[in-house]
């Protein structure tokens, strides 16, 4: 990572910007020797019985070799292969969680999540409910949620992020990561590019709604984003240096969330659009699209919407809309210039699309099978998925366009 785990803990103790949550992660390894160090970690923790959670693809990519290592270490293990749905998608929903809980022995010492975001979300929630720790083994640099506490789950068809627990350790084998599908690498880059708008929404929410804000968490996140942009060529090439930079950035972004105890820094309106599209795909029984691919598309859409719709409307307001709270109105007047500077600091939608396209990601909704009408609807409704987040999209829809 850009910062070592110990450095981040030290910086958090020095930071006075916010009350930080304890980082429960004891070890992070991103190297060729990750599985050997995982075995040593299990010996150190004296874990004798574990459940390996994976799906068919991730078990082939890393689970089988990991189980061989466990066998050599005389660690008893149960393999839980998450069943896919009729579209061959693995979904983090009630069915998957119930499968893990039913297949887990009562005397298990720890879970090991072998996979990408979805497998981790399922394992994170299941282990939390069983009051058992889990260890992260990422198989692709595809999301920034590996080290976070939040578990985005589909509950009765609705996307909800439930606070659960972070892994106690992360062991990412660079050989495995470099073999990840190009689409998953592009998705990881897309999840980092999304920080442009998530950080802007967070700053706006702090100004308008006094939501918690921490300069250290902001700095860790922007540092991770900049590292990815600076090494875009290597990430696009899929070489070891690029994959290492991307994985480090994703892990550090997740640790930043962990410090806050919330995902303010990493998830704004661009994520709400992504979740809205995901729910619609589930309703239509369509194959799912990688989370990072969706936010790679939604981020420039949000930038464009903020710069061409939100800002012009805000700058022309002469009196308080009936639907706007008096306090919000007063703060908007105070921070108008700051909001303008914030929006002007964002890369253009064209620049963001060029970056995502450079690493092989989709840049238009149609490339992901997302209908323009769905995009239009999500810009009006997606903020309702997180009504406790005062994003610019929320302000636009709930405070500025709700007259009458």
From Swiss-Prot:
EC main group: oxidoreductase
Swiss-Prot/TrEMBL catalytic activity: sn-glycerol 1-phosphate + NAD(+) = dihydroxyacetone phosphate + NADH + H(+); sn-glycerol 1-phosphate + NADP(+) = dihydroxyacetone phosphate + NADPH + H(+)
Sequence positions that bind substrate: 144, 191, 275
Known EC number: 1.1.1.261
Annotated positions binding Ni(2+): 191, 271, 291
Chief place of localization: cytoplasm
Cofactor binding: number and manner: Binds 1 nickel ion per subunit.
CDD domains listed in its UniProt record: G1PDH (cd08175)
Gene Ontology molecular function, alphabetical: glycerol-1-phosphate dehydrogenase (NAD+) activity; glycerol-1-phosphate dehydrogenase (NADP+) activity; metal ion binding
Cellular localisation: Cytoplasm
Entry's Gene Ontology cellular component terms: cytoplasm
Classification via SUPFAM superfamilies: Dehydroquinate synthase-like
Entry coiled-coil feature ranges: none
Swiss-Prot/TrEMBL GO biological process terms: glycerophospholipid metabolic process; phospholipid biosynthetic process
Binding site for NAD(+): 55, 117-121, 139-142, 148
Keyword set, alphabetical order: Cytoplasm, Lipid biosynthesis, Lipid metabolism, Metal-binding, NAD, NADP, Nickel, Oxidoreductase, Phospholipid biosynthesis, Phospholipid metabolism
Self-association state and partner proteins as the record states: Homodimer.
Similarity comment text for this entry: Belongs to the glycerol-1-phosphate dehydrogenase family.
Protein name, per record: Glycerol-1-phosphate dehydrogenase [NAD(P)+]
Taxonomic source organism: Geobacillus thermodenitrificans (strain NG80-2)
Gene: egsA
């Amino acid at each position: 990572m850009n910062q070592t785990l110990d450095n981040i803990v030290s910086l958090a103790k020095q930071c006075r910007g916010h009350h930080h949550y304890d980082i429960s992660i004891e070890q992070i390894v991103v190297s060729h020797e990750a599985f050997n160090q995982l075995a040593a970690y299990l010996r150190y923790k004296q874990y004798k019985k574990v459940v390996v959670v994976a799906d068919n693809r991730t078990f082939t990519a890393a689970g089988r070799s990991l189980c061989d290592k466990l066998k050599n270490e005389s660690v008893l293990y149960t393999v839980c292969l998450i069943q896919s749905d009729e579209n061959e998608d693995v979904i983090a929903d009630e069915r998957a969680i119930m499968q893990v809980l039913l297949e887990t022995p009562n005397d298990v010492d720890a879970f090991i999540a072998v996979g990408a975001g979805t497998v981790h979300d399922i394992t994170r929630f299941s282990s939390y409910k069983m009051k058992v720790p889990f260890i992260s083994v990422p198989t692709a640099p595809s999301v920034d949620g590996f080290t976070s506490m939040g578990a985005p789950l589909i509950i009765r068809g609705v996307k909800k992020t439930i606070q659960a627990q972070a892994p106690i350790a992360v062991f990412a084998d660079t050989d495995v990561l470099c073999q990840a599908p190009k689409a998953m690498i592009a998705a990881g880059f897309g999840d980092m590019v999304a920080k442009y708008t998530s950080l802007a929404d967070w700053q706006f929410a702090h100004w308008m709604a006094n939501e918690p804000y921490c300069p250290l968490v902001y700095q860790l996140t922007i540092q991770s984003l900049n590292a990815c942009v600076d090494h875009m060529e290597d990430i696009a090439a899929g070489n070891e240096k690029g994959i290492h930079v991307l994985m480090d950035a994703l892990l550090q972004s997740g640790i930043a969330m962990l410090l806050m105890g919330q995902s303010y820094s990493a998830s704004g309106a661009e994520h709400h659009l992504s979740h809205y599209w995901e729910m619609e795909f589930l309703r239509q029984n369509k194959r799912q699209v990688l989370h990072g691919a969706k936010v790679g598309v939604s981020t420039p859409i949000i930038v464009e919407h903020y710069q061409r719709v939100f800002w012009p409307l805000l700058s022309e307001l002469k009196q308080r809309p009936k639907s706007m709270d008096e306090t919000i109105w007063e703060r908007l007047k105070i921070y108008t210039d700051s909001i303008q500077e914030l929006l002007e600091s964002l890369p253009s939608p064209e620049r963001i699309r060029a970056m995502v396209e450079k690493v092989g990601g989709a840049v238009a909704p149609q490339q992901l099978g997302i209908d323009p009408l769905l995009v239009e609807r999500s810009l009006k409704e997606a903020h309702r998925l997180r009504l406790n987040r005062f994003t610019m999209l929320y302000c636009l829809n709930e405070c500025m366009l709700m007259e009458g």
